[in-house]
Amino acid sequence: MIGQHAPTSDVERLVQRIARLEERVADLQRSLVPLRPFTPVLSAVTTDPSLGSLGSVGGDYTVEGGRCRWAATIVFDGSGVSAGSGAYRVLLPVAPKASITFRHVGSGWWYLPTPTPGFRQVELDASPGGVWARMICEAGEVTHAVPAAPSATAVLSVGGEYPIA
């Protein structure tokens, strides 16, 4: 019995070691997937907002294993900042799988300097039939007025992960 157990123990150790090595290889492969830049867009259902003369956007994403990981920042600043009108949507870098409509695709924060400066938590879900994500806050859909109108120095920072089409 003892002689028969030793090879099994060695085999079990080898199997465990191989599993750890496979996990390490997968971690290394994930770290090597290059980030791709994309230009995020903040849109509103009725009239699009204007980021202003000093406004800026930036984003990056990666696609691996049928999933998209992404991050984006949108900054309002300078003259000409306008909140637009209607519920806000954020452009996703890659179309999500159609079956995930209304499911979570990201989250982040929305810094609004007026009327009371502060950060608001936002969640994003996949809008029906497209590459847009609806913004949601504790008060409901984020709009040009909810939780407050963006003004100069407002910042939206969001990101997430979702299955792609």
Across the structure, where does each feature detected by a protein language model lie?
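Short, ordered beta-strand-loop transition motifs
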Residues: 62-69, 125-130
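Glycine-rich, low-complexity segments
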Residues: 2-48, 53, 98-101, 157-165
